[in-house]
C-alpha cells in the first residue's frame, strides 16, 4: 500500500467543466451566500458554487431577486471566495449579475462584471436572458470575464413572465429557448443554466450544445445540476417546489437546538461548570466596600457601550 497522501483535487476551471461534459461526468453546483456555507459546501465536494441573486429571497427576505444590488453581490461574493479558500479551494466560483447591472448598456455591464471579479473574487459571472443579450455577453467576454448564461425561467423577468412558471412547454416557446441557447453559445458563454423547462427540451438543448448545461427544474439530462443551498438543506419547510429535493432537515434541527438552548438558560442549567472560566487568584472586593462604592459618583464612561 502506498504511503503517499492522495493528490489534491484540481481546481475546477471553465476548461475542466467542458472536459466534464465531454467525459459524461456530472457537474454538482450549489449556491452559497457567506463564508461559512462556502467552506462547508467546498469540503463536501461540490464542483461549482453560485453566489446567486436568489440571496434576495433566501437571505434578505424579499419576494423576488429584483431588489438585490450590485454592491450586495460584490459583498457576498467576496465572503464566499474567502470561505472557499478555507475549504479545499477546488470549487469554481460564479456570481450573478444583479438586476439593472447589465440591461441598460454593454459599457455598464462590462464595468459591473469586472467589479464582481476584481472585488468579489468571482471567476465568472452569470446573467439572465436570451439572444437579445448576445452583444453584452461578447463585450464582457472580450474584457476577459467568462460568462455563464441563464435561460428558461429567468427570475429577474418574473413580471414579464407572469410569475414563476415552467417555460418552453409549447413548440413555439421551446424553439425560442433552443435558439437562445445556440445564440448564447455563439456569443461566448462557457456554460448555460436551464431553469424550469421540460426535461425533454433540456435533453435536446444539452445534446446540441458544446458547452455544459446546468439544470434546475430541468430534469436529469443536463450536464449538471444546481440547487439553492437553503432549499436542499430544508431550511424553510414552507417552500417545497417540485424540482427541489430536501437532502436534510436543517431547519428543524436549528429550531430544536435553539429551543434546547432557551430551555437550559431559563432553567439555569447553562452555562454549567464545564462551560465557565475559573481562577484561584481573583481578589474580590469586600461586600462593605462594594456597598460604599455604589454610593459614590460613578466615573466617566470609557469606550463604547455594548
Curated annotation (Swiss-Prot):
Protein name from the UniProt record: 3-methyl-2-oxobutanoate hydroxymethyltransferase
Entry-linked InterPro entries: Pantoate_hydroxy_MeTrfase, Pyrv/PenolPyrv_kinase-like_dom, Pyrv_kinase-like_dom_sf
Pathways per UniProt: Cofactor biosynthesis; (R)-pantothenate biosynthesis; (R)-pantoate from 3-methyl-2-oxobutanoate: step 1/2
Residues passing through the membrane, by range: none
Catalyzed reactions per annotation: 3-methyl-2-oxobutanoate + (6R)-5,10-methylene-5,6,7,8-tetrahydrofolate + H2O = 2-dehydropantoate + (6S)-5,6,7,8-tetrahydrofolate
This protein's UniProt keywords: Cytoplasm, Magnesium, Metal-binding, Pantothenate biosynthesis, Transferase
GO MF annotations in UniProt: 3-methyl-2-oxobutanoate hydroxymethyltransferase activity; magnesium ion binding
Family named by the database record: Belongs to the PanB family.
Cross-referenced NCBIfam families: panB, PRK00311.1
Subunit structure of this chain's protein: Homodecamer; pentamer of dimers.
SUPFAM superfamilies reported for this sequence: Phosphoenolpyruvate/pyruvate domain
Organism for this UniProt entry: Anaeromyxobacter sp. (strain K)
Cofactor-binding details, from the entry: Binds 1 Mg(2+) ion per subunit.
EC code(s) of this entry: 2.1.2.11
Amino acid at each position: 500500500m502506498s504511503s503517499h497522501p492522495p493528490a489534491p483535487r484540481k481546481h475546477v476551471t471553465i476548461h475542466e467543466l467542458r472536459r466534464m461534459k465531454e467525459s459524461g461526468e456530472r457537474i454538482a453546483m450549489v449556491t452559497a451566500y457567506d463564508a461559512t456555507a462556502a467552506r462547508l459546501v467546498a469540503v463536501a465536494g461540490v464542483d461549482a458554487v453560485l453566489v446567486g441573486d436568489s440571496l434576495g429571497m433566501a437571505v434578505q427576505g424579499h419576494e423576488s431577486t429584483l431588489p438585490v444590488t450590485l454592491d450586495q453581490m460584490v459583498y457576498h461574493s467576496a465572503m464566499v471566495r474567502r470561505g472557499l479558500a478555507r475549504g479545499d479551494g477546488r470549487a469554481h466560483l460564479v456570481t450573478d449579475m444583479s438586476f439593472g447591472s447589465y440591461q441598460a448598456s454593454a459599457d455598464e455591464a462590462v464595468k459591473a462584471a469586472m467589479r464582481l471579479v476584481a472585488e468579489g473574487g468571482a471567476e465568472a459571472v452569470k446573467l439572465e436572458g436570451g439572444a437579445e443579450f448576445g452583444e453584452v455577453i461578447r463585450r464582457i467576454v472580450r474584457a476577459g470575464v467568462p460568462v455563464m448564461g441563464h435561460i428558461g425561467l429567468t427570475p429577474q423577468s418574473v413580471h414579464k413572465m407572469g410569475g414563476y412558471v415552467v417555460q418552453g412547454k409549447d413548440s413555439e416557446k421551446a424553439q425560442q429557448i433552443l435558439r437562445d441557447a445556440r445564440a448564447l453559445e455563439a456569443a461566448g458563454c462557457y456554460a448555460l443554466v436551464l431553469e424550469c423547462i421540460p426535461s425533454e427540451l433540456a435533453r435536446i438543448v444539452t445534446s446540441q450544445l458544446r458547452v455544459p448545461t446546468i439544470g434546475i427544474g430541468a430534469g436529469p439530462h443536463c450536464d449538471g445540476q444546481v440547487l439553492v443551498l437553503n432549499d436542499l438543506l430544508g431550511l424553510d419547510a414552507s417552500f417545497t417546489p417540485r424540482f427541489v429535493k430536501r437532502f436534510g432537515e436543517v431547519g428543524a434541527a436549528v429550531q430544536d437546538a435553539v429551543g434546547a438552548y432557551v430551555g437550559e438558560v431559563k432553567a439555569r442549567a447553562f452555562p454549567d461548570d464545564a462551560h465557565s472560566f475559573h481562577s484561584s487568584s481573583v481578589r474580590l472586593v469586600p461586600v462593605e466596600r462594594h456597598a460604599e462604592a455604589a454610593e459614590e459618583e460613578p466615573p466617566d464612561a470609557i469606550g463604547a457601550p455594548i
